[in-house]
Amino acid sequence: MAEIQRSTDALWWQNAVVYQIYPRSFADSTGSGLGDIPGITAHMDYLDKLGVDAIWLSPFYPSALADGGYDVDDYRNVDPRLGTMDDFDAMVEAAHAVGIKVVVDIVPNHSSNRHEYFKAALAAGKGSPERDRYIFRDGRGENGELPPYDWESIFGGSAWTRVEDGQWYLHMFAPEQPDWNWDNPDVHEEFIKTLRFWSDHGTDGFRVDVAHALKKDMNSPEIAEVSPRDGANRIDGSHPLFDRNEVHEVYAEWRKVFNEYDPPRFAVAEGWVRPERQYLYASKDDLGQIFNFSFATKLWARNNFHEAIEAGIETAERSGSSATWVLSNHDIIRHATRFALPQIPATDQHQIAVDWVLRDGKSYTENRELGTKRARAALLLEMALPGSAYIYQGEELGLFEVADIPWDQLEDPSAFTSQNNGVLKGRDGCRVPLPWVSADADGSFGFSPADASEKPHLPQPAWFADFSADVEADDADSMLSLYRAALKLR
């Protein structure tokens, strides 16, 4: 295969193919059952041959893994189970040696409840400067025994947890993920330090988690009537919890930091906001780019793709940025499966897939032959479009969702909240460790070393043998070969 030509321009990201790595499920170098940073470095040749311009790492920071690493204990370190800072530096060096950029996840809406600032907030008590870094409120009721507001978290269950002194703290996701108070200057400083830290370690850019939720108006007259479950459903920036205009003041600060570097650091927003508002995040004075998730939620229909493409290009033109295209990621059911399930008009395709997973893949027929054909066509469409394409680990192998993970082996907290227990199976089916070799002598399809002391953190199905990287690399008609050819042509 001819050498891949990658852009060295400062605006490389505008037309890049970015490969998302979920580190705990990519490759395990130690036999712990968890993927790690050295495992990524060991497969840099694979990523180089695939032809990607950049890799984006989901969180690899110290964490209790209450939410797959998105509960961050320390924003400026590596989880010791996944490696060391020296390992990270070696990975960046290996990537840069072959022209691959490195993007890391940053999680600014919430920390973990083990972060040093949250521990200090609990110790300092009511009204303290330490507690003001988070969103604490007194409860309702005669003795404050009721939460400040009847809010349901995005994962289900209450969005408030009570602490020993009687106050309650806000967590729009899991209880282990207390929300930062972005009206506090200490919080701004914490993240400025973090952006500079990773930039100084050679990181080329950042993916910003829940970018639309940082700023909240807790004094809004309508605060009691809203909920984290609402989502960003307004076009004027007036929702007390989401997509507020003030969030762009934060990103203007960040843009100044990005521009301190040569070339300037890049950022992309995960912002589930109305199409009319996406351009704000993608402006050159803001983060610079925003994900377009239209492909990830639509039925397989020509008009749906047409609408998604037009909307994505319109956002890019309005912002002066580039469009983005996403078929799968770590939060949604793999597109090969979505395209293999019945496409029922006037139905939420995502919900069809969620119900299918809940029933261990038995509620609908998964037509894998059809799903594969559609996935191949979707790839070629995606690669032909202007802008950036984000691909998720394993989609280049044509992996389907693993629907039948036993309940007692699930890890995703959204499967275990008081509301969702037994009703939603979560996101683990797209986070199963990758199959690298078809021979299963080590019990992990090459994900872990043959002498591994632990099994992979999520179980792999037997059918992974047919989708392993070594098998597909030798098959000119495989999904992997198609991805390599499409990325080279692009």
Located regions from the model:
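Active-site and adjacent substrate-binding regions of carbohydrate-active enzymes
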Residues: 1-490
